């Protein structure tokens, strides 16, 4: 067994040394020196080289032969999902990303939060004004959207949606960018019906920040991606919340008005199996739900537009900059797709 473990580690290290990436134009030539060793482990397959490129690009490490074979099998199954979906010529395409060797069950466990009832949005308090909305909006162009972050193996999406909204509100109000602490929310916001790496809601996080006295910076309270003891220090507070504005459940007209004229808005929706492999285009689904108890992932709506005649929401995710369209995705607008307008709110900062 030790011999096989060494072989697997060598495979990963050797590909990294070669500087190979998943998009290299001639990967077969570059991996030919190790191809024979790789095939000894996973057997001859038309997906072997693709798997080698994938493992190198995303720094995959498999400790045993059985684990490597298992991941290769999952990878091959996900390739088939990508291929069959893209053949349908939908408004979006799937592609290989760092989740391509994960099962749906693993993904759901590590990346998604438990469903929670968004009671705060049963009756919203955002006021629509009688004004013509711009045809499209992208807050990134105004320099107030912070960089895409990665929540890691923790169902803390709600904290990244919260900090993303606050970082944008802060930049809008004070003219400078800031990176805020997700870990403080993971560790300290439990009294407001949040559950750290097991899920939570931005609306409840805004309440915690308001009554706790503020949120620290990322630098002062860095992210670990694990549940921990609360280490909040008031001296390090960087932003305070005066209150939050909730969008009425399912009211996409309110949400669009808020995104157009207020600022980026925290939203939540239901992630289903194929979404984890999203690459580009306007995502739509016939299998996701749209009730408050369906939504399982919080993100940040930063704009909207129209692509090939289909209106969409432009949304910032928290799965890293290599996922999707540079960390972003587009979701069809007008149908409350996957519950995107079911649980929406934005903060007012001080």
UniProtKB/Swiss-Prot annotation:
Family: Belongs to the peptidase C1 family.
Positions bearing carbohydrate: 117, 177, 246
Function as written in the Swiss-Prot or TrEMBL entry: May play a role in proteolysis leading to mobilization of nitrogen during senescence and starvation.
Catalytic activity: Hydrolysis of proteins, acting as an aminopeptidase (notably, cleaving Arg-|-Xaa bonds) as well as an endopeptidase
Native source organism of the sequence: Medicago truncatula (Barrel medic)
Location of this chain's protein in the cell: Vacuole; Lysosome
CDD domains, alphabetized: Peptidase_C1A
Enzyme nomenclature, EC number: 3.4.22.16
GO cellular component: extracellular space; lysosome
EC supergroup of this enzyme: hydrolase
Catalytic residues (UniProt): 157, 297, 317
Chain residues in the propeptide: 20-113, 122-132
A family per Pfam: Peptidase_C1
A molecular function (GO) term: cysteine-type endopeptidase activity
Signal peptide range: 1-19
Disulfide-bonded cysteines: 154-197, 188-230, 288-338
Full protein name: Pro-cathepsin H
GO BP of this protein: immune response; positive regulation of apoptotic signaling pathway; proteolysis involved in protein catabolic process
Keyword annotations of the record: Disulfide bond, Glycoprotein, Hydrolase, Lysosome, Protease, Signal, Thiol protease, Vacuole, Zymogen
Name of the gene this protein is made from: CP
Subunit relationships: Interacts with KPI104 and KPI106. Composed of a mini chain and a large chain. The large chain may be split into heavy and light chain. All chains are held together by disulfide bonds.
């Amino acid at each position: 067994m030790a011999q096989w473990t060494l072989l697997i580690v060598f495979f990963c290290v050797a590909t990294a040394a070669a500087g190979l990436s998943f998009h290299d134009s001639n990967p077969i030539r570059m991996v030919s020196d190790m191809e024979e060793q790789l095939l000894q482990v996973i057997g001859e397959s038309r997906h072997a080289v693709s798997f080698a490129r994938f493992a190198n690009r995303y720094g995959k490490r498999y400790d045993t032969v059985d684990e490597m074979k298992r991941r290769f099998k999952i990878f091959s199954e996900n390739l088939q999902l990508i291929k069959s979906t893209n053949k349908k010529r939908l408004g979006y395409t799937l592609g290989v990303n760092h989740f391509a060797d994960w099962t749906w069950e693993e993904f759901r466990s590590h990346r998604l939060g438990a469903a929670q009832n968004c009671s705060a949005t049963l009756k919203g308090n955002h006021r629509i004004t009688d004004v013509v909305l711009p045809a499209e909006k992208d807050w990134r162009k105004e320099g107030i959207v912070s960089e895409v972050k990665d929540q890691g193996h923790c169902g803390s999406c709600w904290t990244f949606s919260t900090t993303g909204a606050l970082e944008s509100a802060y930049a809008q109000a004070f003219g400078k960018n800031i990176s805020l602490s997700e870990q403080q929310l993971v560790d300290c916001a439990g009294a407001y019906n949040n559950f750290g790496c097991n899920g939570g809601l931005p609306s409840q996080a805004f309440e915690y920040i308001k009554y706790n006295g503020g949120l620290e910076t990322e630098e002062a309270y860095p992210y670990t991606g694990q549940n921990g003891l609360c280490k909040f220090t008031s001296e390090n507070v960087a932003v305070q919340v005066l209150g939050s504005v909730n969008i009425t459940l399912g009211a996409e007209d309110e949400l669009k008005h808020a995104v157009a004229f207020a600022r980026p808005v925290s939203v939540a929706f239901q992630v289903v199996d194929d979404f984890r492999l999203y690459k580009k285009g306007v995502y739509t689904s016939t299998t996701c739900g749209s009730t408050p108890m369906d939504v399982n992932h919080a993100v940040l709506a930063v704009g909207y537009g129209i692509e090939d005649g289909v209106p969409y929401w432009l949304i910032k995710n928290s799965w890293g900059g290599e996922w999707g369209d540079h960390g972003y995705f587009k979701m069809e607008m007008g149908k409350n797709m996957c519950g995107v307008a079911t649980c929406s709110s934005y903060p007012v900062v001080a």
